[in-house]
């Protein structure tokens, strides 16, 4: 409701991925057991099994982050970096079954710890151990596939065109 009241047409906060949510909760629980607090949000368990397709929730269009069909493995910058080109080649046939893609990347996906002189304590985050060169090779492969297989639009461009089902 808050988004609709502020005039937003869409949201992209839904991440329907059991593997991601279970891993996230495992990390957060481990931190709690060690006396540390995470700033991450636990999230609603029902999110894991929500629709992978765009749909209306109240008066706002929800455009979920892409997960692979069937296995619901998350396809975001972090996991693509960890997969590398070999892993992406394995996932590619599943991705081609998806009729909607919402690929999420963050600025941190383009960091190279050595080149950028980032604090070595961040090596605890596995995707930061991967060179920028390797990440760019994987991201380029993915984005070339996307450009060839889908009509590329921003969510802002797509939202007003969507005519799918409305949830009450």
Where are these regions (language model features)?
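Active-site-adjacent pocket scaffolds in enzyme catalytic domains
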Residues: 1-104
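C-terminal domain-boundary segment and adjacent tail
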Residues: 10, 77, 81-168
